[in-house]
Each structure stands twice: as structure tokens, then as C-alpha cells.
Regions:
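Beta-rich carbohydrate-recognition modules and glycan-binding surfaces
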Residues: 64-255
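Glycan-association/targeting regions that enable binding to alpha-glucans and other polysaccharides
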Residues: 1-107
Length: 255
């Protein structure tokens, strides 16, 4: 049914949900015209206008579907999944740019991959930041996030954490809340209780140019952390002008 504007809502019977993924097509009827979406990689021209008819009319099958993940209401909220050297995570350095090497570490047949970040300093007292946008993931699980109490970060359990390694969030109103990371468990999992997050300066990233512009926002008012306002996940660490800084990062989630 239509809920407003171009937004429509449907209730899917539980019996139609198989495994952890729901696949579906959308059939649009207007007058005597019926079009099916998506078209996938079919050879049709003007594929944005859909495929004529509905699947019951065709003498062939189409493997093109939209998909939606299906999870249990009390399951963890994944914030970062390492899949390749990009993995939707951005890297920055303040006060200036530094060299960065990103390498996917995926040599084990039984463990999930890690993403190695290796920063080479070019100036004095650098600070390194890793950020990824997670607002959409939070909004998809609004009810669940209210009950989450721990931020979990998987790292290489055989390597020491970088100096000043901290983790937390930037909210939609521009405030940053972080906590120093404790030592990981024997499984390589860092667990940070959300109640330990503290308001701190917000790094103004990407790096401003010219470089004499402000690089941090210093809050003057103490504002409580609200998980439902999370916009970005942020990790940060300190460096110096002589030593490489390296972190091998795995999946990150809320539970």
C-alpha cells in the first residue's frame, strides 16, 4: 500500500522468508501496461523502464531480483564487513597527508579476512583516523540499537594495538564520542561498553585546505551520547615522525 509520495509498504508472510535473504521483484501496472523490475543484466534496451509483462507471462526465467537481508530481532548490528582493500572505510591523517598502504590479509581458510592499514609518517605528531558511514545500518535496526551496549572490534590478536588506539562514533549533529580500546580477548575481539564512550573533539575530515584552517571542532556543551544518532564509526590512533603505525582490522559490530 502507498504510505506517501513514492513510498509503498508491504507485509511479507513469514512463510515466504527463506534462510537469511528475501529476494523479490516489483511489478508495476499502469492502465494496460505491466512492467517488471529489476531487469538485471538482460540485453533489453531502456532497461530502466523494466521488462514488459510479469514473470508468469514469460517463456523464460530471469535471475534478476532485489534482495533484503533477514536477521533475527536480537542479532548483532554489523557496522563494517571486511571484504576487500576498500571495504567502505576511509583513512585520513591530521595535521597533513601521510603515505598509506592498504592490504587485504586473507591467508587463512578458517578465519575471516583482515584489512591492514600501514601509515608512514611525514610530519611530527600525526594522528590517524579510519571512518565509515553507518547511519543507514543504524536506521535499519532502530529498535535493536536501543538495546545494544557493546561495540565489538576484531583485530589481529597476535599484534599489539597502536599507541592511543581509540574507537567510537560521530553523530548526525557533529559530535564525537570515543573510548580508548582495551586489550583484545584471546579471540582477537575488542569490546567497548557504550557507557564508556566520552564526548571528545571532532576531527574535521577530509583534511581542510589550506592547512591553516581549523582541523578540529571543540565542543563547549556536554551532550549525552544517543546511539540512535550514530552517523559514522571512527577509529583513531597516534603516531610520531619516525615510526610506522600499523593496524590489522576485521569486522566491527554492535551487540
Amino acid at each position: 500500500k502507498r504510505t506517501g509520495g513514492y513510498t509503498y509498504q508491504a507485509t511479507i508472510p513469514a512463510t515466504e522468508i527463506k534462510d537469511d535473504c528475501f529476494r523479490y521483484n516489483i511489478i508495476v501496472c499502469r492502465g494496460n501496461s505491466t512492467r517488471t523490475y529489476p531487469t538485471g543484466n538482460s540485453g533489453y534496451r531502456n532497461s530502466s523502464s523494466g521488462i514488459k509483462g510479469n514473470p508468469l507471462d514469460w517463456n523464460y526465467t530471469s535471475g534478476a531480483y532485489w534482495t533484503t537481508r533477514v536477521v533475527a530481532p536480537d542479532s548483532a548490528i554489523p557496522l563494517l564487513t571486511i571484504t576487500d582493500a576498500d571495504s567502505r572505510i576511509e583513512a585520513y591523517t591530521l595535521p597533513e597527508w601521510n603515505d598509506l598502504q592498504r592490504t587485504l590479509v586473507d591467508s587463512s581458510p578458517v578465519e575471516k579476512p583482515l584489512l591492514r592499514f600501514r601509515f608512514t609518517p611525514k610530519g611530527e605528531n600525526p594522528h590517524y583516523f579510519l571512518r565509515t558511514f553507518v547511519k543507514n545500518l543504524i536506521e535499519e535496526r532502530k529498535e535493536r540499537v536501543k538495546d545494544c551496549s557493546v561495540l565489538c572490534i576484531r583485530v589481529n590478536r597476535t599484534k599489539a594495538l597502536p599507541e592511543g588506539f581509540s574507537a567510537g562514533f560521530v553523530t548526525s549533529d557533529g559530535y564525537t564520542y570515543k573510548s580508548p580500546c582495551p586489550a583484545p580477548s584471546s579471540e582477537g575481539i575488542i569490546r567497548i561498553p557504550l557507557k564508556d564512550l566520552r564526548q571528545t573533539d571532532t576531527a574535521l575530515l577530509p583534511v581542510a585546505y589550506p592547512t591553516f584552517l581549523k582541523q578540529y571542532f571543540h565542543p563547549e556543551t556536554e551532550i549525552a551520547f544517543l546511539p540512535e544518532r550514530i552517523e559514522k564509526l571512527e577509529l583513531s590512533m597516534s603516531g610520531n615522525k619516525k615510526e610506522l603505525v600499523e593496524i590489522e582490522l576485521g569486522n566491527i559490530w554492535l551487540e
